A protein has these predicted regions:
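Zn-dependent metallopeptidase/amidohydrolase metal-coordination segment
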Residues: 185-222
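Metabolite-binding pocket within alpha/beta catalytic cores that recognizes anionic/polar moieties
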Residues: 1-127, 285-286
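Active-site/ligand-binding-proximal alpha/beta "capping" segment
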Residues: 141-181
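A short, charged, Gly/Pro-tolerant segment at domain boundaries
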Residues: 251-286
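Generic non-transmembrane alpha-helical segments
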Residues: 133, 137-149, 234-245
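Non-catalytic positions within long, well-ordered alpha-helices that form the structural scaffold/packing
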Residues: 73-76, 176, 195
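His/Asp/Glu-rich mid-to-C-terminal helical/loop segments that flank catalytic regions of hydrolases
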Residues: 212-257
Length: 286
């Protein structure tokens, strides 16, 4: 088992990893956001990758989602814990609350959501966008390590917007009218790509603000960064607990997600495309 972690540098610095080393990974989808750091925690292999780069130089649109997921797959990762900063769409989910969402609404516009195409067509089910087993595991970890002052929410819908601008008030009010729970910029296409790569994937979302639906409320970078920093210790504790308690007999339907989804005969797939997707789909193309 190798557990991938996608998030900010604060997570890597806080996790008590041993025997660490970095690997520079090249992929058919470009360079990842940064090198992959590998180490051990509680006898488990861990691979860490900062989504936005070490110095947060990639916007939510420009983050190297395909290369990042491919890189984690290539170093042996089979499950991924990610972290996100999000705004709250509910009065009862204040800043500094942790949410383990189980649904996504995709409002992104300019991101490639698939590894496939160019001669290979894959239609994959995505009804449960986060791995249900990983959602439960993260929610249990959050319940175990947070105190009475840190609210945690099990389940909920994450609406993913393109960014990098925050929502308009009309957009924020619309999201609330749909009954959605949090709004952020980074879980898509990450969750879709993780499923295509047959990785068990879920996220810990830390609430930084109330978005702009509240009267006279504006989202500012200062507020977001302040609350993101306040959330960091709780998120770190959840991730460490989740890694330490990850069961050896953990099972996920995501690990066979490509089965029966490839709609192109193997002999019709261009050789260059087949080589590009071999790590992801090779066993289904033999």
């Amino acid at each position: 088992m190798t557990i991938g972690v996608i998030g900010g540098s604060g997570i890597y610095e806080a996790l008590p990893l041993e025997n660490t080393h970095t690997e520079t990974v090249t992929t058919p989808y470009g360079d990842p956001s940064d090198d992959v750091t590998l180490g051990e925690l509680a006898g488990k292999e861990v691979a860490f990758l900062p989504r936005h780069g070490e110095d947060h130089q990639h916007t939510p649109t420009d983050a190297q989602y395909r290369a990042n997921i491919y890189a984690l797959k290539s170093v042996g990762v089979d499950r991924v814990i990610s972290t996100n900063a999000v705004g709250s769409l509910r009065e009862d989910l204040p800043p500094q609350t942790l949410v383990i969402p189980d649904q996504i609404y995709d409002r992104t516009k300019h991101r490639s959501p698939t590894f496939f195409g160019d001669g290979i067509v894959v239609h994959m089910g995505f009804a449960e966008p986060y791995c249900p087993e990983m959602v439960e595991h993260l929610a249990d970890a959050a319940a175990a390590v947070t105190d009475a002052e840190t609210k945690t929410e099990r389940g909920g819908t994450y609406v993913c917007i393109e960014g990098p601008q925050y929502s308009t008030r009309a957009e924020s009010e619309f999201y609330r009218s749909q009954g959605w729970d949090v709004v952020g910029m980074t879980t898509i296409p990450e969750a879709k790509l993780a499923r295509e790569a047959e990785l068990s994937y879920a996220t810990v979302a830390g609430i930084t603000d109330y978005d702009v639906w509240k009267q006279d409320n504006e989202v500012t970078l200062e507020e977001v960064l302040e609350n993101a920093a306040a959330n960091q210790d709780s998120i770190n504790a959840v991730i460490e607990r989740a890694i330490r308690t990850m069961p050896e007999d953990f099972e996920s339907d995501a690990w066979s997600a490509l089965e029966g989804t490839i709609n192109t005969p193997t002999e019709a797939i261009p050789a260059e495309t087949r080589e590009r997707v071999d790590l992801l789909a090779g066993e289904y193309l033999d």
